[in-house]
Amino acid sequence: MPANTSAAIARSCEFSQYLHRLLTARPEERQRLEQSLHHPFSLEDMQAFADWPALDAPEALAPALRRLRQAVVARLICRDLESLATLDEVVSTISQLAEFAVRQALACAAASLPQYGRPIGEDSGEPQQLIVIGMGKLGGGELNVSSDIDLIFIYPEGGETDGARKISNHEYFTQVGKRLIALLNDATADGQVFRVDMRLRPYGDSGPLVMSFAALENYLLSQGREWERYAWIKAKAITGDADGLAQLVRPFVYRKYLDYNAYGAMRGLHAQIRREVARRDMADNIKLGPGGIREAEFIAQVFQLIRGGRDRTLQLRGTRATLERLAALRLLEPAAVAELQASYAFLRNLEHRLQYLDDQQTQTLPEAPETRQKIAASMGHADWPAFLDALNEVRRKVSRHFEQVFILPSEDSASHPLSELWLDVAEQSPETRLAELGYADPAAVARQLTGLAQSQRYLQMPLAGRKQLDALMPALIEVAARFPNADDTLSRIIGLMEAISRRASYLALLTEYPQTLQRLASLYSSSAWVSAYLSRHPILLDELLDARMLYAAPDWPLLAAQLETQLAQADGDVEAKMDALRHFQHAQTFRLVAQDLAGMWTLEALSDELSRLADLVLAAAVRHAWRDIPSRHCETPRFAVIGYGKLGGKELGYASDLDIIFLYDDEHPDAPDLYSRLARKLSTWLTSATAAGVLYDIDLRLRPNGSSGLLVSSISAFRQYQENQAWVWEHQALTRARFVAGDAGIGSQFEAERHAILTLERDPAKLRDEVMAMRQRMLDSHPAHDGDVKNARGGIIDIEFIVQYLILAHAKTLPALTGNTGNIALLAVAAEAGLIDRRLAEDARAAYRLYRRLQHSARLNDRKTVEVDESLRTAYARGRELWRQVFEQALDFS
């Protein structure tokens, strides 16, 4: 044996009375430790420790498990104290031991009841197995070396056993559970394997020892409490049907919506712990005391409770893994997470050293000077004061981060200077005070406030929700008054409050994060469309929390990867995938509109971003809708989405429809049917109104033969149609078409066909007549008036028709016109080639930009028309002048 190994064991014994006693009493254990100290205790080592299958009697298994535990703990103590093991190794090894022991004990307990036979499910007719659930640190794989283990026993179905002596499955599993507990928990001459705590089961000590899936589901739905959601985060099925358990428990723990009420629930649980700590004078408890282990765990778990239902990557059991995920999602600053990780590791290492002393489950600092010195030295400090300084600094850091996350908002509605105005709005006349605040029509504002305060919606709110709204309203009245259009701003905010009054989680969000109120009011002041959008999708309030994320330019490759992760998590659940697409699209749209209102985008750049968003969403929808098609003959569909109109021309607005068609290129005999099913499914995914709303409205009428044509065409049929049957207006539409999503090979074929069609030689006079006739038909159905920049003479459609005519008439000799670069750029190409007057082209470009800006502004403020002023009239005149040059003068531009 190397001298350094012997010295390491001797040093470890100085810090652990338990290890010293064990090695003195069991020389063979010292020998084993000397031979294996430099190797972790693996699962394979545990399996090889004894001939476990032969130990099928409780009296044989019990001592073997206890000796295994002694060997594992002895090696862990030495490896940890000698810095040979990381914290990960310590907690994962002891957790692995607990799971191994549970499985061995369960097998032995079941084998000891042969007279009953097998438990058979009354519904399935299949043999049943006890599901042993590890809770707490065992479930999280972060068990303490001297910890007890929290277990819950569940079985899938009722029924009875099939042996000579029949008993109910409930009775059978109760007996199995009792025997399992005894095998692990009973104190013998060899000690215990693990103390077993069953108090986390439904109804606690007063509840049945075992429970069926159905009974557990009923309990969680009808009686499950908030603290139990916290507890079940870490639940892990050590044996049995893990998937069945997860499907049952996940909806209880992780809500579909963002659950900001979790803050209040966790605060309540923390306050209860603090009261218990104070009552029992436990300030020196590094787990439950201020700045202790539990506070670090709460920080991780509150984000899981709030967001885990929406983001399954947060459905983790371990504290440290969860903290890392929070940093990756930027829910906590990476620097804060690094500090929390280091603090948590310090506290867990300290916890282990306290337990190494005498193999006791303790988290309390010692009082004896000699023991204090041992702890200080084992933590790498010269003396107790130096160690205490380090510990106090760690606890201060944890407390600071805890307070930052759980900062207590003011829910005392009487504390705000305007509280009396809101709380007594129906009994007094607040007009004078509202006028002083800056409201233009205080009487109308007072009527709105009174209407809300006297509405059945408000009066029927639960007390907790009404208290939150009462706390919010004075602050909202104050913040809305800071904006020039204060009356409209507050009116829109009141509409939001009415929309979310039954959604306590959203009220909790605004209460927990009062800094969001200014951002909310700013957006509501700027745009009626945004106000309506947010009221329809209040889940987007979450986007207001982090201004850096809200105003960060989109990183589309990163966002695409995040969306793919969310869709993969919902694999097999079509509704969840449809909602994931909607949540993603709504969130990105909301971020873009916030950035737009902040002046971060030109209109052309904004349209590019909205088009990239649509492209990304369509690509993801195609991939995942195809996976939902049964009997498909290939993994990747030979199918493409082609965008027309505003999508094709990259001129999308916030509420634009998507003009699209579907093409395929596949010789398989089932291809027409499969791709028709895909097209129908994709249309459903895009347009169906789910709980999360609608993704996009789509228009499929530009496909070959329009509404009477096939929903999806082969690329060869599309080519034949375009070359032989398409009308001129369909070729006009093709000028703004592009490949958007799906098979890039089909996209290339489409682009080649588009180029071929656009560069056909045409009779300019005949083309002119057909284009002008089409424009007249549009005017007949949508008469021109100057407040409508789209249909007005000299407006958007006229300029678009000019560009389309120039492309179809001259692309054969000027192929640059086939580039899908937008109307403004194509006007410049035409002018450069001498097809149109340069001055008129530049005027038309400026006019087109003006029209789009006015149209965009009108839509943001829910106006159907624009204000007609001299600059707009001048723009129309320039557009009409270009129209006359192109269509009413000689068409020979050579």
Swiss-Prot record:
Q: Does the keyword Nucleotide-binding apply?
A: yes
Q: Where is this region: Adenylyl removase?
A: 1-410
Keyword Magnesium part of the UniProt annotation = yes
An example GO BP is: regulation of glutamine family amino acid metabolic process
Return the similarity comment: Belongs to the GlnE family.
Enumerate the catalysed reactions: [glutamine synthetase]-O(4)-(5'-adenylyl)-L-tyrosine + phosphate = [glutamine synthetase]-L-tyrosine + ADP; [glutamine synthetase]-L-tyrosine + ATP = [glutamine synthetase]-O(4)-(5'-adenylyl)-L-tyrosine + diphosphate
State a single Pfam family of this protein. Answer: GlnE
Which cofactors must be present for this protein to function? Mg(2+)
Q: Say what the protein does.
A: Involved in the regulation of glutamine synthetase GlnA, a key enzyme in the process to assimilate ammonia. When cellular nitrogen levels are high, the C-terminal adenylyl transferase (AT) inactivates GlnA by covalent transfer of an adenylyl group from ATP to specific tyrosine residue of GlnA, thus reducing its activity. Conversely, when nitrogen levels are low, the N-terminal adenylyl removase (AR) activates GlnA by removing the adenylyl group by phosphorolysis, increasing its activity.
Q: Which GO terms describe its molecular function?
A: [glutamate-ammonia-ligase] adenylyltransferase activity; [glutamine synthetase]-adenylyl-L-tyrosine phosphorylase activity; ATP binding; magnesium ion binding
CC terms in the record's Gene Ontology section:
cytosol
Protein name in UniProt: Bifunctional glutamine synthetase adenylyltransferase/adenylyl-removing enzyme
Keyword annotations: ATP-binding, Magnesium, Multifunctional enzyme, Nucleotide-binding, Nucleotidyltransferase, Transferase
Q: Which organism is it from?
A: Chromobacterium violaceum (strain ATCC 12472 / DSM 30191 / JCM 1249 / CCUG 213 / NBRC 12614 / NCIMB 9131 / NCTC 9757 / MK)
Q: Where is this region: Adenylyl transferase?
A: 415-894
**Root EC class:** transferase
Which EC numbers characterise this protein's activity in its record?
A: 2.7.7.89, 2.7.7.42
